[in-house]
Amino acid sequence: EIKEVGSKWKDQFKPGDKFSIQPALNYEGGPAGLLSAPGYSYRYAGGDATYIIIPSDVMEMGCLLHYNGPGFYPASLSEPLACVIGAMHACYHTHPGSYVHQMEIKDGGKMALLAGVGPMGLAMINYVLRREDRKPSLFVVTDIDQARLDRAATLYTKEFAASRGIDLRYVNTGTVENPVETLREISGGTGYDEVIVMAPVPAVVEQGDDIL
């Protein structure tokens, strides 16, 4: 919530306004160049601070956004959800002999989400199942924590996925002898059009590479 507004911006903001900051400023003049981000790069805008001074870079780049939602919690999800949506849109495919990058997931393709039932993974599942413009025909979600897999399966059921035209499978790769072989068998031996890895674990990254 905005507490005070300087004279330069009083025509656009007022005390009591709720707001959200778009953190990807893409501003070369920031303290860390293009990678500068509120919460990390600015002296008076720390991520753990109770009160902050909005950096002038944020204001000049138009990255202080009005928020008119019911509370702070939904607004706090905008950045992680943007990461999920951006990851989907950043997927691309190529064909031998061509340098053309076909952006986006393959409509009707096969997708695997590895280590996929943490908070960001759940957001990814939600987005995949609810997209209107394109969706996979097979969507395999893995983890090694059965309790978290079970919870994901109650939040996003196979029945709901089927109603959206998606064959959703939850797989505990910690209970199978050869996860790569198991996942390739589920794909029908073809591998997956998209593999998204949600944990920076070398073995899981290698799994992802092996099932593409």
Language-model features: locations:
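Residues forming the Rossmann-fold NAD(P)(H) cofactor-binding site
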Residues: 122
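Helix-to-beta-strand junctions that scaffold the AdoMet/dcAdoMet cofactor pocket
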Residues: 212
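Residue-level "contact hotspot" at macromolecular interaction interfaces
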Residues: 11-13, 74-80, 104-105
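Adenosine-nucleotide cofactor-binding segment
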Residues: 108-110, 114-117, 125, 129-207
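Glycine-rich beta-strand-centered segment in the early N-terminal region that forms part
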Residues: 1-28, 46, 58, 65-67
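A glycine-rich, Thr/Ser-enriched phosphate-binding loop motif common to dinucleotide/cofactor-binding enzymes
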Residues: 43-48, 67-95, 117
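Short helix-loop-beta connector
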Residues: 71, 93-111, 190
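Short, Lys/Arg- and Gly-enriched loop/turn segments at beta-strand edges
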Residues: 26-36
